[in-house]
């Protein structure tokens, strides 16, 4: 826009200049005009070019001829006019120059104004763009505010409805509160009446409970002395068990020594066989060399054939002996490897048995620590009967299985001992025959028969099973003792915290004692507790007899048992001990005075009806005479 205006102004100024020149320019010759256009600042040249000097004109005129004075005057007058015009033209030119300068200054000012206007327009455009962006953001914010306003209106409506519902619920709750307060006041009044009625009865009941707790304390002291005696008995049994384990360990060590000696003898035999093989190889090489030698030039016909046949037979015999010896060596090496594997397995078993012995020593040392324990009689009678039943079942299984296994293993061992000697071949036959004629060794080497080897491994598996079962029995006994001790601690804590615990609605597991009046129920519960303690004292005596009979039978083997072999003497002896233990346990069970007690009969009857009980170390509590039952 500014450039267009500037061009328009320049065009207008040019037009004005042209008009001005046209108006003020006189009619002059073309030469003068041309000189004025080319150089307007020198008027003298124009005048000199436009009119000739007077001398020239005079000479010209003189050339042409004489002129009159009138013509000279006429010529002087236009020259003067032209000089005046030129002076006026120079003044006009200076004025025009001034106007041009002023116009240039105006042009610069206009250009400066145009630049400022451009900058202002750019700023306005930038501001316009910023305003457009702000307008867009304001429109977006306006839309968001409209949506928020809509949601706020909806939430206000929802909260208004909810407040109305809550007001209704509050009214209902206030009504319910008033009803509950009225009911509570009625209940408090009835409770106060009952408390006033029962205050007189509670005093007599507390006095009776104190007397009962004193009696129970005296009974528990008696029971504590009995438990101390039984603890001493357990310590003696522990010492005997430790001595027995030491003897077993010495036997196993002796067996290991014997096996090591047998391994040494087998190695010597192997070395001798290797020497024999080397000798046979040397003889074979000699025979081959003899056969490879050339025959004499003129041998007799018949002796050469006989000699060849003899050499062939000798070669076949030596080759057969060599093959047999190689097979024998391979078999001996296999036997040695298997024997070493068996020795390693037995060492591992010995190590495990030593670890078990150490664990048993630790458990016995823990039991040896003095502890103040009390007993809950009827529950522990049940536990003892279940434990005896488990011991009987385990020992019956052990007795039946291991007596059969022992008889079979005795037969197999005798057969193995008879098959121990290997028949000799060739030059080494005398040595092997002499070894076969020796007496059977106490720890036989591994037999050649695979069936006998399998029997030997099955026998060792039976021994492992027997050891595991005996360990299971010991673990059951330890669980029984720990459970017994924990229950005693719980009972003493209960008696101390709540003296003379309630025996209301108490009865035994069988349900023989039923609930009557309050005083009668408590008396019956106290009587049942006394019967239970007496029965438990009788059970302690019977249990001591049971343990003594078990140890006596463990020291003496049964008359019908087979003679123990050197390989499994201790294991078979243990089997017989377990059988005698079951028989003694059965005898004690027949003579146990618990069966005559009315409190123990339902327990025994329940155990006979449900023989599966007792497989778990957690014993169900069936004696309710000592436990408080708060039904009301």
Swiss-Prot record:
Keywords: Coiled coil. Residues 352-362, 427-440 have a biased composition (Basic and acidic residues). Residues 1-77, 352-379, 423-452, 496-524 are annotated as: Disordered. GO terms for cellular component: cis-Golgi network; Golgi cis cisterna; Golgi cisterna membrane. One of its GO terms (biological process) is Golgi organization. Signal peptide: none annotated. Residues 110-201, 240-468 form a coiled coil. InterPro entries: GM130_C (IPR043937), GOLGA_cons_dom (IPR043976), Golgin_A (IPR024858). Pfam families: GM130_C, GOLGA2L5. Residues 508-520 have a biased composition (Gly residues). Belongs to the GOLGA8 family. This is Golgin subfamily A member 8H. The lineage of its organism: Eukaryota, Metazoa, Chordata, Craniata, Vertebrata. The gene is GOLGA8H.
């Amino acid at each position: 826009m500014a450039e267009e205006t500037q061009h328009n102004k320049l065009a207008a100024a040019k037009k004005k200049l042209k008009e001005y020149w046209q108006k003020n320019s006189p009619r002059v010759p073309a030469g003068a005009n041309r000189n004025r256009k080319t150089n307007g600042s020198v008027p003298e040249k124009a005048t000199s070019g436009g009119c000739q000097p007077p001398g020239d004109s005079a000479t010209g005129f003189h050339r042409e001829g004489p002129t009159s004075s009138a013509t000279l005057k006429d010529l002087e007058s236009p020259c003067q006019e032209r000089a005046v015009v030129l002076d006026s033209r120079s003044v006009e030119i200076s004025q025009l120059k001034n106007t041009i300068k002023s116009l240039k200054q105006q042009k610069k000012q206009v250009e400066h104004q145009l630049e400022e206007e451009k900058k202002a327009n750019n700023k306005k455009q930038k501001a316009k763009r910023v305003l457009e962006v702000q307008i867009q953001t304001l429109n977006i914010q306006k839309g968001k505010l409209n949506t928020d306003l809509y949601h706020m209106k909806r939430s206000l409506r929802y909260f208004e409805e909810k407040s109305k519902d809550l007001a209704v619920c509050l009214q209902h709750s206030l009504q319910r509160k008033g009803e509950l307060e009225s009911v509570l006041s009625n209940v408090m009044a009835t409770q106060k009446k009952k408390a006033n009625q029962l205050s007189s009865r509670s005093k007599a009941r507390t006095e009776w409970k104190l007397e009962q707790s004193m009696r129970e304390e005296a009974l528990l002291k008696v029971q504590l002395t009995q438990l101390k005696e039984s603890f001493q008995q357990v310590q003696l049994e522990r010492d005997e068990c430790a001595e027995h384990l030491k003897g077993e360990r010495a036997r196993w060590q002796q067996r290991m020594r014997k096996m090591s000696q047998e391994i040494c003898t087998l190695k010597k035999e192997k070395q001798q066989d290797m020497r024999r093989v080397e000798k046979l190889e040397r003889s074979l090489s000699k025979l081959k060399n003899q056969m490879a030698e050339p025959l004499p030039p003129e041998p007799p016909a018949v002796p050469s054939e006989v000699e060849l046949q003899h050499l062939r037979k000798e070669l076949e015999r030596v080759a057969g002996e060599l093959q047999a010896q190689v097979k024998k060596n391979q078999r001996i090496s296999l036997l040695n490897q298997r024997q070493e594997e068996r020795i390693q397995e037995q060492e591992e078993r010995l190590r495990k048995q030593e670890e078990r012995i150490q664990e048993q020593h630790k458990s016995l040392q823990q039991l040896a620590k003095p502890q103040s324990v009390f007993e809950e009689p009827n529950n522990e009678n049940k536990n003892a009967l279940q434990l005896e039943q488990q011991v009987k079942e385990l020992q019956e299984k052990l007795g039946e299985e291991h007596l059969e296994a022992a008889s079979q293993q005795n037969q197999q061992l005798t057969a193995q001992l008879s098959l121990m000697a290997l028949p000799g071949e060739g030059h080494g036959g005398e040595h092997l025959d002499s070894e076969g004629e020796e007496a059977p060794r106490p720890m036989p080497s591994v037999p050649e028969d695979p069936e006998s080897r399998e029997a030997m491994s099955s026998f060792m598996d039976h021994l492992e099973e027997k050891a595991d079962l005996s360990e299971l029995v010991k673990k059951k006994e330890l669980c029984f003792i720990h459970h017994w001790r924990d229950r005693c601690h719980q009972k003493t804590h209960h008696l101390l915290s709540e003296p003379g615990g309630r025996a209301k609605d108490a009865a035994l597991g069988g349900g023989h004692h039923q609930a009557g009046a309050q005083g009668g129920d408590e008396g019956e519960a106290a009587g049942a507790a006394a019967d239970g303690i007496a029965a438990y004292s009788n059970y302690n005596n019977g249990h001591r007899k049971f343990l003594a009979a078990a140890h006596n039978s463990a020291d003496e083997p049964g008359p019908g048992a087979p003679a123990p072999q050197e390989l499994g003497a201790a294991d078979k002896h243990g089997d017989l001990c377990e059988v005698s233990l079951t028989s003694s346990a059965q005898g004690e069970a027949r003579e146990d005075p618990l069966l005559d007690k009315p409190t123990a009969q339902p327990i025994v009857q329940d155990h006979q009806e449900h023989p599966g009980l007792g497989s778990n170390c957690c014993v169900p509590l069936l004696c309710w005479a000592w436990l408080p039952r708060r039904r009301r």
